[in-house]
Swiss-Prot record:
Its EC number is 2.5.1.61. Tetrapolymerization of the monopyrrole PBG into the hydroxymethylbilane pre-uroporphyrinogen in several discrete steps. This is Porphobilinogen deaminase. The gene is hemC. The lineage of its organism: Bacteria, Pseudomonadati, Pseudomonadota, Gammaproteobacteria, Enterobacterales. Binds 1 dipyrromethane group covalently.
Length: 313
């Protein structure tokens, strides 16, 4: 590899390419003379579109192929949506940079209704997320929730074709693709607690690649990294992937981290919630202790069912 060239492994969806170009532009602005190339590739999660993600199973559905490219030195960094990044990494790889977070909330998108509460009973709502599903079902058990797969454009087309009365997407993705006008309402965390890392872009690389790590240092956003550290520590203890009914959201308020989390039965019949407040330097321990509380309060049994009997210890 030439000293002034850096290769980015990325998925090929419009949103993934936006994220890769975002990182490319930041790197080139921070390091004039650096040449940044994109290496687009297809992941397993991109190929299996006819099955709900929760049924596909496994962790890292959208990252594994990118990690192989790093290990085989076909790329220097991989750019991910943080909510897709597993809690464990292949040996030799790691998450080294988390960029500044965009709006982490979920978006209510509909052509005919202004809000979730305005939907008539029996309305069909689309989402691919068990996390969104359990919170929707708890608040509105009278709605019909159906699986919704594909990239953002595909999902919006299915809404526009009349297959759904409303769909739930991430505010960040819609804003990044210039589709903010499609958002009827941003759902506050009290109604739809976001996914771990939602709205943040993470960068993975080979841990022994000091040159690349030095180039990436300028892109790390300290506050976002603290918040996502707390969220991911909780998720790690719960052994959660991105396809389980787990929500976690940390805010930094008055110098203190406020971490909220939930684990829910997919049908919304039971949701275990908890929260912690503490010093930023204790972010990781806060996440772990909150996960322990959730497990002891019933989350262990919920996750055992979702994981087909294989519950966190």
């Amino acid at each position: 590899m030439l000293d002034n060239v850096l290769r980015i492994a990325t998925r090929q969806s419009p949103l993934a390419l936006w994220q890769a170009h975002y990182v490319k532009d930041k790197l080139m602005a921070s390091h004039p003379g650096l040449v940044v190339e994109l290496v687009p590739m297809v992941t397993r999660g991109d190929v299996i579109l006819d099955t709900p993600l929760a049924k596909v199973g496994g962790k890292g559905l959208f990252v594994k192929e990118l990690e192989v490219a790093l290990l085989e030195n076909r790329a220097d960094i991989a750019v991910h949506s943080m909510k897709d990044v597993p809690v464990e990494f292949p040996q030799g790889l790691g998450l080294v940079t988390i960029c500044e977070r965009e709006d982490p909330r979920d978006a209510f998108v509909s052509n005919n209704y202004d809000s979730l509460d305005a939907l008539p009973a029996g309305s069909i709502v689309g989402t691919s997320s068990l996390r969104r599903q359990c919170q929707l079902a708890e608040r509105r058990p009278d709605l019909i929730i159906r699986s919704l797969r594909g990239n953002v454009g595909t999902r919006l087309s299915k809404l526009d074709n009349g297959e759904y009365d409303a769909i739930i997407l991430a505010v960040a993705g819609l804003k990044r693709l210039g589709l903010e006008s499609r958002i009827r309402a941003a759902l506050p965390p009290e109604i739809s607690l976001p996914a771990v890392g939602q709205g943040a872009v993470g960068i993975e690389c080979r841990l022994d690649d000091t040159r690349t790590r030095e180039l990436l240092a300028a892109l790390n956003h300290h506050e976002t990294a603290l918040r996502v550290t707390a969220e991911r520590a909780m998720n790690t203890r719960l052994e959660g992937g991105c396809q389980v009914p787990i929500g976690s959201y940390a805010e930094l308020i008055d110098g203190e981290i406020w971490l909220r989390a939930l684990v829910g039965a997919p049908d919304g019949s039971q949701i275990i919630r908890g929260e912690r407040r503490g010093a930023p330097q204790n972010a990781e321990q806060m996440g772990i202790s909150l996960a322990e509380e959730l497990l002891n309060n019933g989350a262990r049994e919920i996750l055992a069912e979702v994981y087909n009997g294989d519950a966190p210890a």
